[in-house]
A protein has these predicted regions:
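Hydrophobic faces of well-ordered beta-strands that scaffold small-molecule active sites
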Residues: 8-14, 31-33, 61-65, 97-99
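Active-site-adjacent beta->alpha loops and helix N-cap segments on the catalytic face
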Residues: 17-21, 25, 37-60, 76-80, ...
Length: 108
């Protein structure tokens, strides 16, 4: 078995296309694109994602999927919105999505 060293990835949180481009120019391996950073990060707009995907050619693009700030307890309607956002990201060729969800039962 060969000794394979694992490379550390350089990931940058970006709040828009401009930040994505700066991260790519700075050598980032991956960008996590999000809006609403003061709220803890929310899903960016369709246009922001589409343009970021087009502009990033050497850096992987991951998009946060979060319909709002606050807790991570989502209503069924919010989950449906998140599922649609994931489908949109897939159609746009995003490399991955970032999700956090807390189940109510896990709080007990």
């Amino acid at each position: 078995m060969q000794n394979q060293s694992k490379k550390c990835l350089f990931e940058v949180c970006a709040n828009g296309v401009e930040s994505c481009m700066a991260a790519q120019e700075g050598g980032a391996d991956r960008v996590e694109l999000c809006a609403g950073i003061p709220e803890g990060g929310t899903t960016p707009s369709y246009g922001e994602i589409k343009i970021a995907r087009r502009m990033l050619n050497t850096t992987r693009l991951h998009v946060i999927i979060r319909p709002r700030g606050g807790d991570f307890l989502y209503t069924p309607l919010e989950v449906e919105r998140m599922e649609e956002d994931i489908r949109m990201c897939r159609q746009l060729g995003v490399d991955g999505v970032v999700i956090r969800k807390v189940e109510f039962a896990s709080l007990i």
